[in-house]
Amino acid sequence: TCRYLFGGCKTTADCCKHLACRSDGKYCAWDGTF
């Protein structure tokens, strides 16, 4: 299952669609896409 907004992650692949893994905070954040 994918990680939702502010969920923990190691890479962007861990996050749900339209989310990207922040390298500084290790959490999923919106990547700016719709």
Swiss-Prot record:
Signal peptide: none annotated. Keywords: Disulfide bond, Ion channel impairing toxin, Knottin, Neurotoxin, Potassium channel impairing toxin, Secreted, Toxin, Voltage-gated potassium channel impairing toxin. It holds the Pfam family Toxin_12. The record marks 30 as: May be involved in interaction with voltage sensor, positioned at 9 angstroms from the center of the bilayer. Changing residue 22 to A: Exhibits <150-fold weaker interaction with Kv2.1 channels. Expressed by the venom gland. Changing residue 20 to S: No change in interaction with Kv2.1 channels. Changing residue 23 to A: No change in interaction with Kv2.1 channels. Reversibly inhibits potassium currents in oocytes expressing Kv2.1/KCNB1 channels (Kd=2.7 uM). Acts by shifting activation of the channel to more depolarized voltages. The toxin may bind to the S3b-S4 helices of the voltage sensor paddle. One, two, three or four toxin molecules may bind the Kv2.1/KCNB1 channel. It shows low to moderate affinity for lipid bilayers. It partitions into the bilayer membrane, where it stabilizes at the water/membrane interface. This is Kappa-theraphotoxin-Scg1a. The presence of a 'disulfide through disulfide knot' structurally defines this protein as a knottin. Belongs to the neurotoxin 10 (Hwtx-1) family. 09 (HaTx) subfamily. Changing residue 32 to A: No change in interaction with Kv2.1 channels. Shows no or very low activity on Nav1.2/SCN2A, Nav1.4/SCN4A, Nav1.5/SCN5A, Nav1.6/SCN8A, and Nav1.7/SCN9A (IC(50)>3 uM). The record marks 3, 5-6, 22 as: May be involved in interaction with voltage sensor. Its main location: secreted. It is found in: Secreted. The lineage of its organism: Eukaryota, Metazoa, Ecdysozoa, Arthropoda, Chelicerata. Changing residue 12 to A: No change in interaction with Kv2.1 channels. GO terms for cellular component: extracellular space. Changing residue 18 to A: Exhibits 7.5-fold weaker interaction with Kv2.1 channels. Changing residue 1 to A: No change in interaction with Kv2.1 channels. GO terms for molecular function: ion channel inhibitor activity; potassium channel regulator activity; toxin activity. Residues 4-6 are annotated as: Involved in active face.
